[in-house]
Amino acid sequence: MNHFSKFSVTKRLLILEVLFSAISFGISIYIKVFGRSSIVTFFLLCFHLVPNALFLFPWTIITTSFVDANVFTLLSSILILSVYGVEIERSWGHKEYLLFCQFLTVIPNIAVLIPCFIAYKITDSHYLLVAIIQSTTAIQAGILTAWYQLYSCKKEESSNKFLCPLSKYLIYLFLSIHLFYVFQSFPWTYFCLAVSGTCISELYVLFVHPVVQELFHLESHTQLPI
């Protein structure tokens, strides 16, 4: 069985993350070496700044979900997708896993943008309108939460049995790390994305997943080759 087939949603997510992160890193290096320019600012709006960029480039609300700001978060994302994402995709199938990832890429960003906009209206601080949220944090938190819901509750049979004893603590560790980031002067939005990704994943598994299974007559695809 191939770890990733040509139809794998996980494979496509990994490609997007590496590609967008590389572009983002390249832009950052260009700015440090050559200074800012109108062209660089244009690309920054495409990949970085939300919600300022949202008014000019609506797709940034999605693209920012596939850009990691540093090597640590990128490696963490690759690991979580390659291990836990594969498990969920194998169980749910490609189509539902894609739907699940769409929930995790759009809704958490909106959940962060709304309080930013409200706070801006109250304080009139333009800093709040430049909330950097380029991060796969919501996707990682959502996948970890869904995996915990599926396998730790013995609803499905996990092929990675050595991970089951740790599943109870993974999401709490993940949230704790991102809360620690806030105290280390990292953007507070990362923690907000982690929390919103966790909540959305909980709601999806409890309410949306059973409905999707019923509507489309889907069954568990534990042997799906991905």
Swiss-Prot record:
Membrane side Cytoplasmic: residue ranges: 63-65, 119-191
Record flagged with keyword Ion transport: no
Main location: membrane
Record's keyword terms, sorted: Membrane, Signal, Transmembrane, Transmembrane helix
Signal peptide feature range: 1-26
Topological region Extracellular: 27-41, 87-97, 213-226
Membrane topology designation: Multi-pass membrane protein
Chain segments annotated as transmembrane: 42-62, 66-86, 98-118, 192-212
SS bond partners: none
Domain of life of the organism encoding this protein: Eukaryota
GO cellular component, one term: Golgi apparatus
Location within or outside the cell: Membrane
UniProt xrefs under InterPro entries: Rhomboid-like_sf (IPR035952), TMEM115/Pdh1/Rbl19 (IPR013861)
GO biological process: retrograde vesicle-mediated transport, Golgi to endoplasmic reticulum
Protein name per its UniProtKB record: Protein pdh1
Source species taxonomy: Eukaryota, Fungi, Dikarya, Ascomycota, Taphrinomycotina
